Amino acid sequence: VRTCPKCQRTYPDDADFCLKDGTPLPSASSVTESELASGLARRYRIVKKLGAGGMGAVFLAEQIALGNRPVALKVLSRRLLDDPEFLLRFHDEATSTARIRHTNVVTIYESGQSDDGTPYIAMEYLEGETLRHALRRRGALPVAECAEILSQVARGLNAAHKLGIIHRDLKPDNIFLTRGDE
């Protein structure tokens, strides 16, 4: 699946351009685990790739300086490194999200560039699944569970809105359900 980095519409792997706005569709991040590991070796140890999307890939890593704390490393696709608009969007995502302090919003630890210049965001690693995955796996969710999920999403969005931050990409893929009482 290829995702338009502007409007987030998804297309089959053989599509090259977004039908809505004509944006070229990037493939999954071309950053390999070994390349990423060598570029961040002093700071992080890459454990595994968690997933990929239109703007890049996310890896489970351990932050070496802090006792191998697990983190999710979001890495911008190399295909977008020469596009100032995407570099700015990636940076804005990190700085905006880092301003939000709320239990229903992932915590950003830092953002930066690997030794080869690949931008990354290190954030809280959450165990669980996206709402999209839960819906595909379980089908329709009970009304009470939906109400609780929506309540938590609304509280997180409210915290963002109080800071003047608008999400702009709220969808089941971007709602993460953690395990247990988290």
Can you annotate each of these PLM segments?
Residues 2-23, 28-182:
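Conserved ATP-binding/catalytic core of the eukaryotic-like protein kinase fold
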